[in-house]
């Protein structure tokens, strides 16, 4: 009898081909929403997605709220998946007594609910890591990050402070991490845990056992550092525990051959090639339960995306292009804004292309998309755009425009975590602390 870990195997031109089975009727309950054997619901995945330099207010903010909002120029690229996307306008980032760190305050506030106190550092774990602490047990990787522009530093996934989790920098590096050494075919009859992983787990256990003695000999500052270290050790042990179990491949997917090396940088033509491929690998990673939390970035804050031949590029255009007196906005910048939405759509389409249970992978995800500024020319933070996609396994309504009416951006983060079934009553700190999710979206 088949079980949900069964894989089809074969060879193609001498290479191993692996295809996971979909959630067949015999594996699901009568509604196609849960595993028949255990009654457990399909896993809900979480993803953050970062793009730099925001959008143009006159071109993206709908005039009407609710489900029947009008299509705006800069939301038009998202129309194919409009019914699965929520748009949030009228949100603000309060810096309180901190400076407005250019191109950083919006990033930190959106990702943590806290106004940053230092440039390029987060004042707590980012939202994806807070979610991963709860949902990732049993997945091979607690979380994975990827940079479409090929810079490992372009990751806005962090354990707090300067502890940013480095991003995979190319489709090949992401593929190798996910489906290279350590990825085993669970349908093999002789499947067994990797001895190297077993040895590493044993060594870590010995180190952890010596924790108490070491901590007694340290001062307060060093004890804090050791706490961070042992937290990392524990997370490594949990990952290894997952690797010592058969991986779960639960969607109708074929693991492709490794991609070729390709240029990964800020040139828009390259991003248009790389982003869909990285997105496809991200979708496969979540569909095969390699990870349940994924962070994707297409640029840094203050995006340096450029079109070959454009002497200014995106970032410089936001500061040097004059506002057209007739249009009331910067037309070149507005075009770059649209390109960002097109790249975001390519990410969502890859998630939506994988059938799973009674819907698609996107239906069983929640994607949290954020940026660094509202109006890039002056680094304004009021009106910073926020987007979510996917219904988190039916826990969030979609297809809405929500006008935040000046409320803190942290309300979106709290709403997202509530939809992910994270137990918390408030999120953020200072002026951005909130106990008010957008309850009209929660199911």
Regions found by a protein language model. Give the residues of each.
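Ligand-binding pockets and gating/stacking loops
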Residues: 1-443
């Amino acid at each position: 009898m088949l079980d949900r870990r069964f894989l089809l195997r074969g060879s193609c031109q001498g290479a191993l081909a692996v295809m996971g089975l979909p959630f067949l009727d015999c594996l699901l309950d009568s509604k196609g929403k849960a595993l028949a054997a255990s009654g457990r619901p399909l896993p809900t995945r979480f993803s953050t997605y970062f793009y730099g330099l925001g959008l143009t207010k006159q071109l993206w903010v709908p005039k009407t709220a609710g489900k029947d909002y009008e299509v705006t120029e800069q939301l038009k690229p998202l129309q194919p998946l409009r019914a699965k996307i929520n748009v949030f306008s009228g949100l603000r980032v309060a810096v309180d007594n901190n400076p407005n760190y250019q191109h950083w305050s919006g990033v930190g506030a959106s990702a943590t609910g806290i106004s940053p106190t230092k440039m390029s550092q987060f004042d707590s774990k980012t939202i994806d890591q807070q979610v991963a602490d709860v949902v990732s047990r049993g997945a091979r990787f607690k979380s994975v990050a990827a940079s479409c522009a090929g810079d490992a530093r372009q990751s806005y996934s962090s354990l707090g402070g300067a502890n940013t989790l480095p991003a995979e920098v190319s489709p090949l590096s992401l593929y190798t991490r996910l489906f290279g050494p350590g990825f085993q075919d669970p349908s093999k009859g002789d499947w067994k845990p990797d001895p190297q992983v077993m040895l590493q787990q044993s060594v870590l256990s010995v180190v952890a056992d010596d924790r108490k003695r070491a901590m007694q000999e340290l001062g307060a500052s060093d004890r804090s550092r050791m706490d961070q270290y042992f937290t990392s050790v524990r997370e490594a042990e949990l990952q290894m525990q997952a690797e010592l179990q058969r991986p779960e491949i639960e969607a109708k997917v074929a693991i492709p051959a490794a991609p070729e090396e390709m240029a990964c940088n800020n040139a828009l033509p390259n991003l248009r090639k790389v982003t869909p491929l990285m997105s496809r690998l991200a979708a496969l990673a979540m569909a095969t339960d390699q990870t349940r939390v994924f962070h994707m970035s297409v640029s840094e804050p203050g995006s340096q995306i450029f079109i070959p031949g454009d002497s200014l590029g995106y970032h410089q255009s936001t500061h040097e292009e004059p506002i057209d007196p007739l249009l009331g906005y910067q037309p070149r910048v507005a075009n770059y804004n649209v390109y960002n939405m097109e790249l975001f759509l390519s990410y969502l389409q890859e998630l939506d292309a994988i059938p799973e249970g009674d819907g698609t992978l996107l239906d069983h995800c929640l994607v949290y998309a954020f940026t660094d500024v509202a109006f890039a020319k002056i680094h304004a933070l009021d009106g910073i755009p926020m987007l979510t996609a996917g219904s988190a396994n039916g826990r969030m309504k979609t297809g809405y425009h929500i006008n935040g009416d000046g409320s803190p951006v942290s309300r979106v983060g709290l709403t997202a975590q509530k939809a992910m079934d994270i137990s918390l009553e408030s999120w953020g700190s200072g002026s951005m602390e909130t106990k008010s999710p957008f309850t009209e979206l929660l199911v």
